[in-house]
Amino acid sequence: MGQKVNPIGLRIGITRGWDSIWFSQSDYKKNLHEDIKIRKFVQNRFNNAGVVKVVIERFPEKINVNLHTAKPGIVIGQKGANIEAVKKILKTMTDKPVNLNIIEVKKPETVAQCIAESIALQIEQRQPFRRVMKQELRRAMRGGVEGIKILISGRLNGADMARRENYKEGRIPLHTLRAKIDLGFKEAKTTFGQIGVKVWTYSGDFIQSKEESEEDKYAVKRRTS
């Protein structure tokens, strides 16, 4: 099961929170489609800015969009010009004022999405894919991750038949729910077609605080008594 399913979706509520923070009974469908449009627009607009995650918070009178990015300077633009332009477009899409909050990713060399985008960009620049994968592998391990796996698939080096290659270092415990597993995906567009890049990173286990563990024990006792 852990080998097939998306590791982020499997661990929501355990090691990772939701990317859409709101509740609605009547407008659920409308809000869901708006969230999808907002994410697509932001990711297309800042395609090369290392956008890792887009968290959307909804309030009765406004919407907060928290943009986690490895390159905040590209997103902000000169004197905040990009932010103001994006705010206007999002306001017309949602009919509500939108606050755009930029959150910088501190160590992009350990974030799966940033690694995948870096590999895809270098493949598009005709760099040898094996060398690129090994470099990113070593950089991530030096950055502090406990395990990393990189998989690329497609017409590698322009071969007639598509194939896949992967490199792995450390361990990736996909079946352990408390493990902090991150997944990144990016497509490299080459003259021979698209090459898919997937990256899994493992950065330790989620450890509960003493208060949370005591609450869990108390809940178990109440159920069994």
Curated annotation (Swiss-Prot):
UniProtKB keywords: Ribonucleoprotein, Ribosomal protein, RNA-binding, rRNA-binding
Disulfide bonds: none
PROSITE patterns linked: KH_TYPE_2, RIBOSOMAL_S3
Quaternary structure and interacting proteins, as annotated: Part of the 30S ribosomal subunit. Forms a tight complex with proteins S10 and S14.
Any single biological process term in GO: translation
Family: Belongs to the universal ribosomal protein uS3 family.
InterPro entries in UniProt: KH_dom, KH_dom-like_a/b, KH_dom_type_2, KH_sf_prok-type, Ribosomal_S3_C_sf, Ribosomal_uS3_bac-typ, Ribosomal_uS3_C, Ribosomal_uS3_CS
Function: Binds the lower part of the 30S subunit head. Binds mRNA in the 70S ribosome, positioning it for translation.
GO cellular component annotations of the record: cytosolic small ribosomal subunit
Source domain of life: Bacteria
Lineage: Bacteria, Pseudomonadati, Spirochaetota, Spirochaetia, Leptospirales
Pfam families per record: KH_2, Ribosomal_S3_C
Protein name as it appears in the record: Small ribosomal subunit protein uS3
HAMAP family with a match to the protein in the record: Ribosomal_uS3_B
SUPFAM superfamilies: Prokaryotic type KH domain (KH-domain type II) (SSF54814), Ribosomal protein S3 C-terminal domain (SSF54821)
Span of domain KH type-2: 38-106
Matching SMART domains: KH (SM00322)
